[in-house]
Amino acid sequence: MKIKQIASLLLFVISLCLPLSAKDIFVSLSTGKNKNAGTKEAPYKNLWKAIAVAKDNDVIHIAEGIYPGRMKCGWFKLIKPVSLIGGYSADFAQRDPLKFKTMFQPRNEHNDKKAGAQGILHIELDRSPMKAPKGFHMVIDGIIFDDGFASSYHATKGKPAGFDTGMWLEGPAMNKAADKFPSANRYSIHTAAASRGDGNLTIRNCTFVNGSNYAVNVNWYKGKVAILNNVFCNNRMLSVNVACSNGSGKINWECANNTILFTWSRLNDLADMGFAVRNNENCNANIHNNIIGLNVLTGFDNTKGNPKRKTTKLDNNIFFLNRESDVQMTISPSIAKVKVDGFEDLEGTDGIESIEGNVDLKDPSIFKGRINAKYLNAFLSMKYSEKTKLDPGKCNALRSVLGLPLQGTITTKCDMYANRYPWAEALNLFGAVKDYGAQLPK
C-alpha cells in the first residue's frame, strides 16, 4: 500500500513538471472582440488581450492589421514562453505574411508610453532560474516590425532628392514642426539580460525595417536561438545580435537565409557600429546562406569578447558593398578589416572554425526592382570628410542594372543618415536569390 502511495505521488509530481499541451489563440483586429473566446471563429480583437490570457507554450495566431499595443503604447511584452504567428487573413482561411501583413508600427505621438519595454517586442521571462520556464520553444513568425513612424527626422538636413524625410535624429533632438516626441530609440525585438529560462527561440519570416536601435537583440540564458529567413533593412547599429546571459554556460545559435542591408552607424559621422551580424562571448554561431550587403561598417563583427570563449562558422554567404569590410575581427593588438576575397587567411583565427564558400555578389541585376533605387543611389554616393570607401566599379555595376546614372568618381556629397525607407519595398527583398538570403515565406 505504501509503495502504491509513493508511486502515485511520484506520478503527480512528474505531471506537474510536464508542460501542458499548447493552446491555439486567435486575434483579428478587424473582426475580433476582446469579449470573444479567442477561437478561430470568435477571435480576440487585440493582441495584448491574447498575451494576457495565454499560458506557457500557447500559440497566438494574428491576422493582418497594424497592432498598436494597449492604449496605443507601441509595444508588447511577453513574460511567458508564448509563440506569435502573423500573416493570416482576417478569417484565418489563408496565411501569407507578405500579402496579409501583420504589423507592429508604432507612432511618434505615443513615444511617451515607451517606458514599459525596451523593444517593440520585449521578452522577459522569470528572473529566477528555479522558477523560470524550461523545455519550451518560442516562435516569432511572419511579423513586420517598422519603427520608422515613431522616429523623428530632420526636415531638410541629409535629405536627398525624392526622399520623404531628412536624416534620423537622436533625442533630445527632434523635428518639432512634425513630431510630438524625439525618436523612440529602441530595439525591435529585445530579450532582457536578466531573463532566465531553458528553452529555444526561433525568429523567422519577419521583416525588420527602419529600426531605431538594434533590430534583434537577444540575450539568452539556456537553449538554442535561430534567426531564419528574415529581411533586415535600414536598422541602426546592429541588425542581429545574440548574446549569452549565462556567465557559466554557452548557447548555440544559427543565423541563416537572412537578407541584411543598410545597417547604419551609431551616429551620423559613420564612425562606429553599423554591423549586420555580431557573435559574442559564450556563443557558438553558425552563420550561413545569408545576403549581407550595404552595411555602413562591416558585414560580420567578431570583435566583442574573448575569442577563446566563442566559435563561429561563417559559410556560404553573399557579401557586397559593405562600406569598410565584410568581416571585422581582433587580431591583437589591432582590428583587422577583411573583404571576402581575403577570407582564406581567417580560418582558425579569433574563434573562426569554418569560413568556406563565401562569395562576392556576381550579378547585381538580382536586385533590380527589389531595392529602392533612390535610396540605393544616395547610399552609394555618401561622402563625408574622407573619400568614399566603396568600390566605384562595383557601385556603378549596381547603378547600371537599376538604371541609375554612372559616376566616374564618387564625389557627390550626401550626408544622409538612416532616413526612413519605404517599408513596403523592404518586402520585395524576399526571394531575390535562390538558396541565399530570405526566401519567400512558406
Language-model segments: residues:
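Right-handed parallel beta-helix/beta-solenoid
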Residues: 20-49, 66
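Right-handed parallel beta-helix/beta-spiral solenoid domain characteristic of secreted/periplasmic
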Residues: 82-178
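Bacterial N-terminal signal peptides
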Residues: 8-17
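N-terminal extracellular ligand-recognition/capping segment immediately after the signal peptide
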Residues: 48, 56-94
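Right-handed parallel beta-helix
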Residues: 86, 135-149, 164-178, 198-210, ...
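Acidic, glycine- and Ser/Thr-rich low-complexity intrinsically disordered tracts
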Residues: 93-103, 107-109, 172, 179, ...
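Positively charged n-region of N-terminal signal peptides that target proteins for export
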Residues: 1-6
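Short glycine/acidic-rich loop motifs that flank beta-strands on beta-rich extracellular proteins
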Residues: 71-73, 94, 108-109, 114-118, ...
